[in-house]
Amino acid sequence: KVGDDKDNDAVIREDLFREQMKFLKDNGYNPLTMEQLYEYVVNGAAVPEKPVVLTFDDGYADTYSIVYPIMKEYGFPATVFINPGDIGTRLTWDQVREMHKNGITIANHGFQHIEMGQLSEAKQIENITKAQEALAKEVGIKDNPWFCYPYGDKNEFTDSASKKAGIKMGMAMKSGWAHTGDNPYNILRVWVGNA
Protein backbone atom coordinates (compact mmCIF):
# COMPACT_ATOMS: atom_id res chain seq x y z
CA LYS A 1 0.00 0.00 0.00
CA VAL A 2 1.30 3.46 -0.90
CA GLY A 3 0.12 6.57 0.90
CA ASP A 4 0.75 8.96 3.73
CA ASP A 5 -0.30 6.84 6.74
CA LYS A 6 2.85 7.40 8.80
CA ASP A 7 1.69 5.15 11.66
CA ASN A 8 1.24 2.01 9.56
CA ASP A 9 4.40 0.08 8.63
CA ALA A 10 2.42 -1.72 5.90
CA VAL A 11 2.07 1.59 4.06
CA ILE A 12 4.98 3.20 2.23
CA ARG A 13 4.89 6.95 1.89
CA GLU A 14 4.31 8.15 -1.66
CA ASP A 15 7.47 10.30 -1.69
CA LEU A 16 9.62 7.33 -0.62
CA PHE A 17 7.97 5.05 -3.16
CA ARG A 18 8.72 7.57 -5.92
CA GLU A 19 12.34 7.81 -4.71
CA GLN A 20 12.68 4.02 -4.71
CA MET A 21 11.37 3.68 -8.27
CA LYS A 22 13.68 6.49 -9.42
CA PHE A 23 16.58 4.68 -7.71
CA LEU A 24 15.77 1.47 -9.58
CA LYS A 25 15.64 3.31 -12.92
CA ASP A 26 18.75 5.44 -12.31
CA ASN A 27 20.82 2.46 -11.14
CA GLY A 28 20.07 0.03 -13.94
CA TYR A 29 17.66 -2.33 -12.20
CA ASN A 30 15.51 -4.42 -14.50
CA PRO A 31 11.97 -5.17 -13.35
CA LEU A 32 10.81 -8.60 -14.51
CA THR A 33 7.37 -9.89 -15.37
CA MET A 34 5.93 -12.83 -13.44
CA GLU A 35 6.50 -15.02 -16.50
CA GLN A 36 10.20 -14.09 -16.53
CA LEU A 37 10.46 -14.86 -12.81
CA TYR A 38 8.72 -18.20 -13.31
CA GLU A 39 11.03 -19.16 -16.18
CA TYR A 40 14.05 -18.21 -14.05
CA VAL A 41 12.90 -20.18 -10.98
CA VAL A 42 11.59 -23.27 -12.76
CA ASN A 43 13.75 -23.52 -15.89
CA GLY A 44 16.87 -21.53 -15.03
CA ALA A 45 16.21 -18.99 -17.78
CA ALA A 46 18.62 -16.09 -18.00
CA VAL A 47 17.51 -12.78 -16.53
CA PRO A 48 19.07 -9.34 -16.99
CA GLU A 49 21.54 -7.97 -14.46
CA LYS A 50 19.98 -6.42 -11.36
CA PRO A 51 16.60 -8.11 -11.71
CA VAL A 52 13.71 -7.09 -9.48
CA VAL A 53 10.03 -8.07 -9.43
CA LEU A 54 7.50 -5.44 -8.34
CA THR A 55 4.41 -6.89 -6.66
CA PHE A 56 1.54 -5.16 -4.90
CA ASP A 57 -0.95 -7.07 -2.79
CA ASP A 58 -4.64 -6.49 -2.07
CA GLY A 59 -5.57 -4.03 -4.82
CA TYR A 60 -5.96 -0.87 -2.77
CA ALA A 61 -7.25 2.32 -4.42
CA ASP A 62 -3.71 3.78 -4.33
CA THR A 63 -2.59 0.98 -6.63
CA TYR A 64 -4.54 2.73 -9.37
CA SER A 65 -4.06 6.36 -8.30
CA ILE A 66 -0.35 6.23 -7.35
CA VAL A 67 1.39 2.97 -8.30
CA TYR A 68 -0.06 2.57 -11.79
CA PRO A 69 0.93 6.08 -13.04
CA ILE A 70 4.45 5.65 -11.66
CA MET A 71 4.83 2.24 -13.34
CA LYS A 72 3.72 3.83 -16.63
CA GLU A 73 6.12 6.75 -16.13
CA TYR A 74 9.11 4.42 -15.69
CA GLY A 75 7.93 1.72 -18.08
CA PHE A 76 8.12 -0.88 -15.31
CA PRO A 77 6.14 -4.10 -15.39
CA ALA A 78 4.39 -4.85 -12.11
CA THR A 79 1.94 -7.38 -10.72
CA VAL A 80 -1.11 -6.53 -8.63
CA PHE A 81 -2.67 -9.38 -6.66
CA ILE A 82 -6.38 -8.68 -6.14
CA ASN A 83 -9.29 -10.20 -4.23
CA PRO A 84 -12.28 -10.07 -6.61
CA GLY A 85 -14.62 -10.25 -3.62
CA ASP A 86 -13.34 -6.82 -2.55
CA ILE A 87 -13.86 -5.12 -5.92
CA GLY A 88 -15.90 -1.98 -5.41
CA THR A 89 -14.49 -1.32 -1.95
CA ARG A 90 -10.94 -0.57 -3.14
CA LEU A 91 -10.60 -0.80 -6.91
CA THR A 92 -13.31 -0.99 -9.54
CA TRP A 93 -13.39 -3.51 -12.37
CA ASP A 94 -12.94 -0.63 -14.83
CA GLN A 95 -9.70 0.37 -13.08
CA VAL A 96 -8.49 -3.24 -13.02
CA ARG A 97 -9.26 -3.65 -16.73
CA GLU A 98 -7.42 -0.41 -17.57
CA MET A 99 -4.31 -1.45 -15.65
CA HIS A 100 -4.37 -4.90 -17.26
CA LYS A 101 -4.78 -3.39 -20.74
CA ASN A 102 -1.76 -1.14 -20.11
CA GLY A 103 0.79 -3.71 -19.00
CA ILE A 104 0.09 -4.33 -15.33
CA THR A 105 -0.25 -8.03 -14.57
CA ILE A 106 -3.43 -8.66 -12.60
CA ALA A 107 -3.22 -11.84 -10.56
CA ASN A 108 -5.08 -13.94 -8.01
CA HIS A 109 -5.02 -13.21 -4.26
CA GLY A 110 -8.04 -15.41 -3.52
CA PHE A 111 -11.65 -14.41 -3.98
CA GLN A 112 -11.73 -13.36 -0.33
CA HIS A 113 -8.69 -12.22 1.65
CA ILE A 114 -8.74 -15.17 4.05
CA GLU A 115 -5.95 -17.22 5.58
CA MET A 116 -5.45 -20.24 3.36
CA GLY A 117 -3.73 -22.15 6.16
CA GLN A 118 -7.00 -22.22 8.09
CA LEU A 119 -8.90 -23.88 5.22
CA SER A 120 -9.29 -27.44 3.98
CA GLU A 121 -7.87 -28.26 0.57
CA ALA A 122 -11.37 -28.11 -0.96
CA LYS A 123 -12.04 -24.64 0.51
CA GLN A 124 -8.65 -23.40 -0.70
CA ILE A 125 -9.39 -24.65 -4.22
CA GLU A 126 -12.79 -22.94 -4.03
CA ASN A 127 -11.28 -19.59 -2.95
CA ILE A 128 -8.67 -19.71 -5.72
CA THR A 129 -11.06 -20.99 -8.41
CA LYS A 130 -13.76 -18.44 -7.64
CA ALA A 131 -11.16 -15.68 -8.11
CA GLN A 132 -9.93 -17.30 -11.34
CA GLU A 133 -13.50 -17.28 -12.67
CA ALA A 134 -13.96 -13.61 -11.75
CA LEU A 135 -10.67 -12.63 -13.42
CA ALA A 136 -11.74 -14.47 -16.58
CA LYS A 137 -15.25 -13.01 -16.62
CA GLU A 138 -14.46 -9.41 -15.66
CA VAL A 139 -10.97 -8.86 -17.10
CA GLY A 140 -10.62 -11.56 -19.74
CA ILE A 141 -7.70 -13.22 -17.96
CA LYS A 142 -8.11 -16.91 -18.68
CA ASP A 143 -6.06 -19.46 -16.75
CA ASN A 144 -4.19 -16.94 -14.59
CA PRO A 145 -1.11 -18.82 -13.31
CA TRP A 146 -0.02 -16.49 -10.47
CA PHE A 147 -1.19 -16.50 -6.85
CA CYS A 148 -0.24 -14.65 -3.68
CA TYR A 149 -1.24 -16.26 -0.37
CA PRO A 150 -3.32 -13.84 1.73
CA TYR A 151 -1.29 -13.01 4.84
CA GLY A 152 1.33 -15.40 3.44
CA ASP A 153 -0.57 -18.16 5.21
CA LYS A 154 -0.31 -21.75 4.00
CA ASN A 155 -0.75 -25.28 5.28
CA GLU A 156 0.08 -28.79 4.08
CA PHE A 157 -2.72 -28.62 1.46
CA THR A 158 -1.90 -25.26 -0.10
CA ASP A 159 0.63 -26.27 -2.76
CA SER A 160 -1.64 -29.09 -3.94
CA ALA A 161 -4.73 -26.85 -3.87
CA SER A 162 -2.88 -24.20 -5.88
CA LYS A 163 -1.82 -26.73 -8.52
CA LYS A 164 -5.33 -28.19 -8.77
CA ALA A 165 -6.73 -24.67 -9.26
CA GLY A 166 -4.36 -24.01 -12.18
CA ILE A 167 -1.71 -21.95 -10.37
CA LYS A 168 1.92 -22.34 -11.50
CA MET A 169 3.61 -20.02 -8.98
CA GLY A 170 2.68 -18.72 -5.54
CA MET A 171 4.15 -15.75 -3.70
CA ALA A 172 4.88 -15.97 0.01
CA MET A 173 5.24 -13.23 2.61
CA LYS A 174 8.51 -14.58 4.02
CA SER A 175 11.49 -12.39 3.30
CA GLY A 176 14.18 -13.59 0.95
CA TRP A 177 15.37 -13.85 -2.64
CA ALA A 178 14.12 -16.10 -5.42
CA HIS A 179 16.57 -18.59 -6.90
CA THR A 180 16.55 -21.14 -9.69
CA GLY A 181 15.28 -24.41 -8.25
CA ASP A 182 13.13 -22.86 -5.51
CA ASN A 183 9.69 -24.31 -4.85
CA PRO A 184 7.53 -22.29 -7.27
CA TYR A 185 4.70 -22.41 -4.72
CA ASN A 186 6.76 -20.64 -2.07
CA ILE A 187 8.50 -17.71 -3.76
CA LEU A 188 10.08 -15.43 -1.19
CA ARG A 189 9.82 -11.65 -1.47
CA VAL A 190 11.49 -8.68 0.18
CA TRP A 191 9.17 -6.37 2.09
CA VAL A 192 9.82 -2.76 1.17
CA GLY A 193 8.52 -0.11 3.50
CA ASN A 194 9.46 3.36 4.67
CA ALA A 195 13.21 2.68 4.63
What is each residue range found by the language model?
Residues 60-61, 112:
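Short, glycine/acidic-enriched loop or turn micro-motifs at the edges of active sites
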Residues 68-75, 89-107, 163-164, 181:
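Acidic (Asp/Glu)-rich catalytic clusters
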Residues 56-57, 108:
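Active-site flanking residues adjacent to catalytic metal/cofactor-binding acidic residues
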Residues 81, 109, 170-172:
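Short beta-strand and adjacent tight-turn residues that come in two discontinuous sequence segments
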Residues 1-55, 61-62, 118-195:
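C-terminal active-site subregion of NodB/CE4 polysaccharide deacetylases
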Residues 107-122:
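Substrate-binding clefts and substrate-entry loops adjacent to catalytic sites
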